Amino acid sequence: MTWRVVHVSQSEKMRLKLDNLLVQKMGQEFTVPLSDISIIVAEGGDTVVTLRLLSALSKYNIALVVCDNEHLPTGIYHSQNGHFRAYKRLKEQMNWSQKQKDKAWQIVTYYKINNQEDVLAMFEKSLDNIRLLSDYKEQIEPGDRTNREGHASKVYFNELFGKQFVRVTQQEADVINAGLNYGYAIMRAQMARIVAGYGLNGLLGIFHKNEYNQFNLVDDLMEPFRQIVDVWVYDNLRDQEFLKYEYRLGLTDLLNAKIKYGKETCSVTVAMDKYVKGFIKYISEKDSSKFHCPVVSSLEWRK
């Protein structure tokens, strides 16, 4: 499996050279085999990217994350329908019943709140709020009709970052929000790459239904992985003023962090891949035996 996340800052040009990414920067050239790469994060508004490289990125199912002048991810380029049975997958996806989708969302939401509870326990936060999240996850109905996910998130963020904290996605965000937004965007890009690689159409979600969002399914499935970013931001950015380059690199490198998936220890990227595979098996065959999500407290960098 491809594993490398390449972070390119202030380069002049990125192009293809013999199935390698070639980066030209300050009179020097750097090459990375495309077969090793899962994601490229590009910063710097003057970078030129050739069409031949973009075509090769699609062929190798490599996601390209583009950042603005404030270093915030603003776009994702990824392959579409690269799976050898894309039409079969699409037909299956369009035939998912509402009951199947509601049950899948119930499972995903359970994993998300379970990880939020785990994060609060890791940082020895209020036992009352930890118990409240535990109650919320047990109350989740198919389709989360009572919005336990929304209630849990409010309790979670207020407890983790303080009652004055408000989640915002605007560019004027404080360093905590900027870190969360950056990390979530990287996770989203990786999930989009994996979802497309398995022939799933990101437009057709199990819960999200925004007609303007091509990543509805991606946004559904990535929910239990957001807490990996939350832990890193809490550990590293609470006393910082700006989201400096070294912190952006750290957030990007979260995809390579080691975490437990079932009985196996693997990278976050591999865990995401296994998770999507398990989701497909569950929703297609009603077999939940492989549909797991890693628990955040098993992250090895904190041990």
Label every PLM stretch briefly.
Residues 35-85:
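Glycine/small-residue-rich interface belts in oligomeric ring/scaffold proteins
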Residues 8-51, 55-56:
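N-terminal ordered "arm"
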